[in-house]
UniProtKB/Swiss-Prot annotation:
The keyword Chloroplast applies. GO terms for cellular component: chloroplast; small ribosomal subunit. It comes from Anthoceros angustus. The gene is rps12. This is Small ribosomal subunit protein uS12c. CDD domains: Ribosomal_S12. It is found in: Plastid, Chloroplast. SUPFAM superfamilies: Nucleic acid-binding proteins (SSF50249). PANTHER family: 30S RIBOSOMAL PROTEIN S12 FAMILY MEMBER. PROSITE patterns: RIBOSOMAL_S12. Part of the 30S ribosomal subunit. The keyword Cell cycle does not apply. One of its GO terms (biological process) is translation.
Amino acid sequence: MPTIQQLIRSKRQLVKSRTKSPALQGCPQRRGVCTRVYTTTPKKPNSALRKVARVKLTSGFEITAYIPGIGHNLQEHSVVLVRGGRVKDLPGVRYHIVRGTLDTVGVKDRKQGRSKYGVKKPK
């Protein structure tokens, strides 16, 4: 506990809240170019091959982003849109690739929850 004299000398420091997606730099999304597209395995209780991509953003950051949905068309040099949002069972993956924009196509044969996977309304 500081004395009154110590508080006069220097006021209390504000606690700054850390952002969960620093590479976006306060923007809702960022554009980037895929440098590597590969699969990784999740943390302990789960088992799968999760599709991820290394992306070089326009902000200069190189990040790992998750590719949601079943099947994708991404490869090296694909231009993608990246949003925030981590994947709980993949350590270090704090971003999602937005489906249905730029070089990323929407998920094929998707009927429900279409807006999250960039799919137009079926006729």
